[in-house]
Structures are given as structure tokens and as C-alpha cells.
């Protein structure tokens, strides 16, 4: 290990001790549990579109076309099926994230693997799935599901979802921005 790597590790440890460590978890962490990456998810949506719409190359538009052509219920069922919700378990990375004792965890993932790991390790994190959860924070530690959650029925995946994000999630957006301004952010799985 070189001096820069050692310095970074010490910086992360110090931030954790001072309750200033935030871990931002991307889809790469869940792939180790068998969850497909973004491209594979979009490809599964594309396969069910009419031939004339399969030529679309913009991922957000593909998701939007699927949702618009199949309806919301079928869209959500397809996403849940593609992401194997309820059929997967946390992997060692999920537990390692918790071992770092971050004061907050931010994720763009829709799955509940982090929540499962939290429950198995008997740790307390208040899960924020929607703006209305923020005023009721019960614990110092939070898990912020920045792109929504299946249980809350508010995932962010389509073109319209991204376009309307600041209107649909203004408090979560502001909260995450405040964390970026005041904490050490460690990105994992991007």
C-alpha cells in the first residue's frame, strides 16, 4: 500500500469517528448479489417493446416508452422481476459498508439489500424513501434511497422521472446536497 492509499484510509477512518462519513452506494454493489446493472435492466424492457420502438438508444426514453405503452402496473412488475426483488440477499460488501459505520448511506438502488444487511447487523438507520420521511428522522443515522423504493412505489427510472426529480424529491435533494457540503462522501459501486 502506498502513502496516498494509506492517507485516504486514515482520512476515511477519521471521518467515521467524527460522524462525518457518508457512503454513496451504486448499482455495482448489488451486482455481487445477482442484481443486473442498468444496461441489462433497460435491455429487458426494450425486448418487450414493439419492434418499431426497440430502435431507441436513449435508456431513459426506453424506460419511458415501456411505462407509457405497458402501463404503470406492468412496468413496476417488470422492474421488480428484472431486479429479482425478494429473491436476493446482501453480499459481503453490504456488510463491509455497515462496518465502516457511516452516519448516512445514500443509494440510487431500488433493492432492499442494504436494509436487509442493517436488520441482520442489528444497526439502527432511519430509511428515507420519500420526502415526507425526512421531517420524522428517528435516528442519527439515515439510509437515503435517493431514487425511490419499490415499497414506496416511487422509483426514478424514466425520462419523466428524471426531468421531474427536483419537483418530486425537493427535500431529499436538498438533504443530499447538504451532506455533500458538510461530510466526506465515499463512493462505492459506481
Show where each model-derived region lies.
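Conserved catalytic-core helix/loop/strand module for nucleotide-ribose chemistry
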Residues: 1-184, 188-190
Amino acid at each position: 500500500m502506498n502513502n496516498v492509499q494509506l492517507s485516504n484510509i486514515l482520512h476515511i477512518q477519521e471521518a467515521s469517528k467524527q460522524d462525518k462519513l457518508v457512503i454513496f452506494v451504486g448499482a455495482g454493489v448489488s451486482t455481487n448479489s445477482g442484481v443486473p446493472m442498468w444496461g441489462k435492466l433497460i435491455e429487458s424492457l426494450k425486448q418487450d417493446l414493439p419492434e418499431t420502438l426497440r430502435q431507441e438508444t436513449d435508456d431513459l426514453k426506453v424506460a419511458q416508452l415501456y411505462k407509457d405503452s405497458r402501463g404503470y402496473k406492468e412496468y413496476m412488475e417488470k422492474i421488480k422481476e428484472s431486479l429479482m426483488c425478494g429473491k436476493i440477499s446482501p453480499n459481503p460488501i453490504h456488510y463491509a459498508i455497515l462496518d465502516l459505520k457511516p452516519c448516512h448511506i445514500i443509494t440510487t438502488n431500488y433493492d432492499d439489500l442494504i436494509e436487509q444487511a442493517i436488520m441482520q447487523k442489528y444497526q439502527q438507520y432511519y430509511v428515507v424513501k420519500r420526502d415526507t420521511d425526512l421531517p420524522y428522522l428517528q435516528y442519527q443515522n439515515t439510509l437515503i434511497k435517493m431514487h425511490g423504493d419499490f415499497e414506496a412505489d416511487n422509483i426514478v427510472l424514466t425520462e419523466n422521472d428524471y426531468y421531474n426529480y427536483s419537483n418530486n424529491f425537493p427535500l431529499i435533494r436538498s438533504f443530499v446536497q447538504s451532506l455533500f457540503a458538510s461530510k466526506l462522501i465515499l463512493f462505492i459501486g459506481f
